Design a protein with these regions (language model features):
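Conserved C-terminal helix/tail region of periplasmic/extracytoplasmic solute-binding proteins
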Residues: 52, 83, 178, 184, ...
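Extracytoplasmic/periplasmic substrate-binding proteins
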Residues: 58, 228-231, 236, 253, ...
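A structural signal for short loop-to-beta-strand junctions that line the ligand-binding cleft
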Residues: 100, 107-108, 136-177, 327, ...
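Long, aromatic- and glycine/proline-rich binding clefts that accommodate carbohydrate-like moieties
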Residues: 151, 318-325, 372-424, 428
Length: 463
């Protein structure tokens, strides 16, 4: 990308920061280990011993700091580099990372959501790692959709190395489906089948003597609300942006149809309205506690069921949890949002060699597998994805979703702001559905507002 273009993107990113809410250097070619061969890493030619790398992470699993420290311990022992792992909540991380990039008062490495990488890159405060990624296998070591998250449209560069990935699938209670007389093999094969399943679950009312709702999902309080609703839009033939990424298409007839599928679940009493006042973690806990028969979640939920220290599970829910692929529409295969997190190095880092050595280590196939098994995500790299996906049938469902059903968003600097515009209107639409006063015309009007705001943001970049 030409320098003037990069400057314009930096200006846009700074100018529109007030609209945001929290979502989701020099090198040493010999530092760290060969990312495809060893776990602890080869001895670096240039000693990094005695350096300290600060690493910001988000809430990855139930014990994010302890799990990450466990994973980096062999790296510390082999290289002599100390890794300080610091937790930054998803609700504040966007502002924290932005402020650190602009001020220069930053850690060395930060985790960033895949959809946030273009925005952060446009700030100009992060290293371009393009000349180093051959050391970790380059693009061929990753699925195309995952590698795409490392880049910014229109630029030559790699700004965030993929760390882990995730997709969303249907979670359900086997005992609840049995009580409703529904065969799990056909319960979620299409959107029509999903709705029929929820109608039968609604009639059950109780499982094991305890009340249960057929389905639940979060509303406006969920930072990832757009990730939850866009699959319905995609399944209806809609899209978030035009093919050239210059105009919003969230108000297209197909997008309206997709959003309407979700709001109909609310209006027909199949989606527990009380869940709309909760955030994603709270809804997840409702499922784990036995109060929902079906919900949509990521692979970390499955992993948490295997952890004895996660006491949010009821015995019945833990014993009966199962997963199924997202159901498709009339002419679609059942899309799901595919996301995750990447690792970015701040330009202000005084330990860029050590920072890259850490990223290289965390890109090792076995290290990625070990970390995925700890926190319940999927590795970003192809080979360990296959390894984790083959561990049991439930993991196979997530692996299939990542390979065959996953979609994400355009890698443009404005996406974080556009997503926020969509989130605000999606939340309002769901609130109106819960209140019983939502018409098709109102859905269209609200999505028109979202599209208008998004077009304004996209136009600023074009200027």
């Amino acid at each position: 990308m030409r320098k003037s273009r990069m400057t314009a993107l930096m200006a846009v990113a700074l100018a529109v920061l007030s609209f945001l809410v929290a979502a989701c250097g020099s090198s040493s070619d010999d530092a760290g280990d060969n990312a495809t061969k060893t776990n602890a890493g080869a001895t670096p030619a240039k000693s990094l011993k005695g350096q300290t790398v600060r690493l910001w992470i988000m809430n990855n699993g139930p014990n994010p700091v302890a799990d990450t420290r466990k994973i980096v311990a062999p790296f510390e022992q082999k290289t002599g580099v100390k890794v300080n792992v610091e937790l930054v909540g998803w609700d504040v991380q966007l502002d924290r990372i932005r402020n650190a990039a602009v001020s220069g008062e930053a850690p060395d490495v930060t985790q960033a959501g895949t959809t946030q990488v273009p925005f952060f890159a446009a700030l100009g405060g992060f290293e371009n790692e393009q000349d180093k990624v051959s050391q970790i296998g380059g693009a061929s070591a990753y699925a195309p959709g995952i590698w795409k998250t490392s880049q910014v449209e229109g630029q030559d560069g790699v700004w965030g190395v993929p760390w882990f990935t995730e997709a969303r699938t249907i979670y359900y209670r086997k005992d609840a489906l049995k009580a409703a007389g529904v065969d799990p093999k056909t319960a979620f094969t299409s959107q029509e089948a999903l709705k029929a399943t929820l109608e039968k679950l609604k009639a059950v009312k109780e499982v094991g003597g305890k009340p249960i709702s057929p389905f639940g999902g979060p509303g406006k309080k969920a930072y990832d609300l757009v990730h939850n609703l866009m699959p319905w839009v995609w399944d209806a033939g809609g899209a978030e942006l035009s093919s050239d990424n210059k105009q919003s298409t969230i108000n297209s007839p197909q997008a309206v149809q997709g959003v309407k599928f979700a709001t109909d679940l609310v209006g027909e009493g199949l989606w527990d309205k009380s869940m709309l006042e909760r955030d994603g973690q709270q809804v997840e806990d409702q499922f784990k506690g036995g109060r929902l028969a079906v919900f949509i979640g990521g692979p970390w939920v499955l992993q948490s069921a295997k952890r004895a220290d996660d006491d949010t599970w009821s015995d019945a829910a833990r014993k009966n949890v199962a997963v199924a692929p997202m159901p498709g529409g009339a002419n679609s295969k059942g899309y799901t949002f595919i996301g995750g997190s990447n690792l970015m190095v701040f330009k202000s880092s005084q330990h860029k060699d050590a920072a890259w050595a850490l990223i290289k280590y965390l890109s090792d196939d076995q290290v990625q597998t070990d970390y995925a098994n700890l926190m319940g995500m999927f590795p970003a790299r192809l080979k360990p994805q296959e390894q984790v996906g083959a561990t049991d049938p439930d993991h196979e469902a997530f692996y299939a979703a990542i390979k065959d059903q996953g979609r994400s968003y355009a890698p443009i600097a404005q996406w974080a702001q556009v997503e926020n515009a969509y989130k605000n209107q999606f939340g309002q639409i769901l609130d109106q559905a819960a209140g019983g006063d939502l018409s098709d015309q109102q859905i269209q009007s609200d999505l028109d507002k979202a599209a208008k705001e998004a077009d304004g943001l996209l136009a600023q970049s074009a200027g």
